[in-house]
Amino acid sequence: MEENIINGKVIAEDITSTLAVCINDLKVQHNVTPCLIVILVGDDPASHLYVRNKQRKAEMLGLRSETMLLPSTTSESSLIDTIRRLNNDDSVHGILVQLPVPKHIDKNLIINTIDPRKDVDGFHNENVGRLFTGQKKDCLIPCTPRGCLYLIKTVTRNLSGSDAVVIGRSNIVGKPMACLLLGENCTVTTVHSATRNLPDYCSKADVLVAAVGIPHFVKSSWIKPGAIVIDVGINAIEEGGVKKFVGDVDFSEARNIASAITPVPGGVGPMTIAFLMVNTVIAACNQAGIENFVEKYLDL
């Protein structure tokens, strides 16, 4: 059933190739070159890999991008000073602090030090508040949930009246994902570690989004036949002495039940980076007073 697999890698490449044209036109027509600064504190190997991927994609698209590597001993006050300097630099349009940060640094304080107009992760309280109060056009939306919704809408444009279940309640994925689905007029249920009879909720979902970080947590028996299944999880496991990455959904069985399903890897992951680039260009346009420029190129 290859035809029911949602190829996030191909879809993300379509988005970024269109975005590259948008960026070039933005430069030519408005003399604006979007600029993204990524701040990485410490030496976490996974974080360094993520940041390299973001940097590579930004450069491919014609964005101006820079990674600031700071030692793990960087003080909270020093990091705040760095962010404030970038906030005041009109040539910088997007600021991203790669998470996690060292334990001596208050993550929420750092996120909310970023100018909300430059908060391309969409985590600042102001952006969160606007999203939750239905002001989607006036905020930067978290990249992973935005990418998930885009994938869902490649399967069906009309979600109105659909029953949607989001497994997970994180601020990064679960909560904003539920909010975006509400905005599409879905009836949304959020389930989590304390939910009783969790499979019963899942089995009623027309749209099921799994974001719990537990390998193969969602069984095929939980899935409603014909459901759209979006697997946000990316979990490292060892199988026969070989390290591999799997999702939160038991993909091998679930693919036979779902009408459409994302694989891991190659599903949601590429969309997260694609929408980070989209958010950076939107932020640049907003700061330059250019309205609805990206929307001329991408159906957002």
Curated annotation (Swiss-Prot):
Entry-linked SUPFAM superfamilies: Aminoacid dehydrogenase-like, N-terminal domain, NAD(P)-binding Rossmann-fold domains
Reactions the enzyme catalyzes: (6R)-5,10-methylene-5,6,7,8-tetrahydrofolate + NADP(+) = (6R)-5,10-methenyltetrahydrofolate + NADPH; (6R)-5,10-methenyltetrahydrofolate + H2O = (6R)-10-formyltetrahydrofolate + H(+)
EC number in record: 1.5.1.5, 3.5.4.9
CDD domains in UniProt: NAD_bind_m-THF_DH_Cyclohyd (cd01080)
GO BP: any one term: methionine biosynthetic process
Family: Belongs to the tetrahydrofolate dehydrogenase/cyclohydrolase family.
Subunit structure comment from the entry: Homodimer.
Job of this protein: Catalyzes the oxidation of 5,10-methylenetetrahydrofolate to 5,10-methenyltetrahydrofolate and then the hydrolysis of 5,10-methenyltetrahydrofolate to 10-formyltetrahydrofolate.
Protein name as catalogued: Bifunctional protein FolD
Record gene name: folD
